[in-house]
């Protein structure tokens, strides 16, 4: 499935940090298309995986939005800068079951399962100078919001959080009225743009994955989290799905990775980065 004009989907040139070990693209022992908001886990995760499976040396992986990775799989490749990446992944992960269902219908995956969960948090500057205490506070006229764009996978969970906290009125206030007023500013890559805006004083708050607050703090950024509360943070809705592609070029190594991702060691690595493990 190429894009509507028949071309391969294009990976924005600015996403170079999400293409890892491209030199192994055609000779990899394992190819992973990981939902992008796991980017902060991958070094620790793959370091431990390689210790357990030292024969899996060359790992090419992407940490792009899973919707873009899905288009890449269905189109048979994607264009990145001056290269065509047409490698079939061994493993694909997504935060929506719809993506897995589409791949299943088209015969690209046979089985998939949930392996992880996440939750939402409100990222604010250290000390919470605007005294933001709840999701409803984002409707205040004086609060500047760094809001993930609708094409980002986190966006519909955030909208659900707003609706749960304040109904359609709060959704309209934040996404329409405050956008028109200039106090809701949308992002393209929220996990980079939101921490930058907050630390530079360009935004007061940004709804993000809780894991992204943990990562920003590990990077030394002076931010903290305001917890929406379990009733609102979507933890029961945010599921991460994983599957081996039916035509995986390295099926044996793909199975090793699937076994590893369920292991207590892998789940603990995710927990340390703020995720909610599925296999307790």
For each predicted feature, which ranges?
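Exported/periplasmic ABC-transporter solute-binding proteins
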Residues: 1-60, 68-71, 82-87, 96-97, ...
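Glycine/small-residue-rich interface belts in oligomeric ring/scaffold proteins
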Residues: 73-75
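Catalytic metal-binding acidic patch
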Residues: 90
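A short alpha->loop->secondary-structure connector
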Residues: 109-110
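Conserved, well-structured beta-alpha core segment at the onset of a catalytic domain
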Residues: 113
């Amino acid at each position: 499935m190429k894009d509507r004009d028949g071309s391969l989907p294009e990976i924005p040139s600015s996403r170079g940090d999400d293409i890892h070990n491209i030199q192994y693209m055609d000779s990899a022992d394992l190819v992973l298309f990981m939902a992008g908001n796991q980017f902060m886990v991958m070094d620790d995760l793959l370091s431990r995986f390689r210790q357990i499976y030292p024969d899996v040396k060359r790992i090419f992986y992407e940490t792009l939005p899973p919707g873009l990775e899905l288009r890449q799989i269905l189109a048979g490749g994607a264009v990145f800068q001056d290269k065509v990446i047409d490698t079939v992944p061994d493993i694909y992960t997504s935060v929506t079951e719809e993506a897995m269902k589409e791949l299943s219908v088209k015969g690209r995956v046979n089985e998939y399962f949930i392996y992880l969960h996440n939750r939402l948090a409100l990222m604010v500057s250290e000390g919470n100078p605007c005294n933001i205490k709840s999701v409803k506070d984002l409707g205040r006229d004086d609060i500047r919001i760094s809001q993930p764009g609708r094409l980002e996978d986190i966006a519909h969970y955030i909208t659900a959080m707003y609706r749960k906290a304040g109904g359609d009125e709060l959704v309209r206030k934040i996404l329409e009225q405050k956008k028109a007023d200039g106090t809701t500013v949308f992002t393209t890559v929220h996990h980079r743009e939101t921490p930058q805006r907050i630390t530079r004083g360009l935004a007061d708050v940004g709804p993000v994955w809780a894991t992204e607050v943990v990562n920003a703090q590990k990077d030394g950024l002076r931010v903290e989290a305001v917890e929406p509360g379990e009733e609102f943070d979507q933890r029961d809705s945010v599921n991460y799905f994983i599957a081996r592609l039916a035509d995986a070029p390295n099926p044996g190594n793909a199975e090793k990775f699937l076994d590893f991702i369920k292991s207590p060691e892998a789940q603990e690595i995710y927990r340390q980065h703020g995720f909610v493990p599925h296999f307790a």
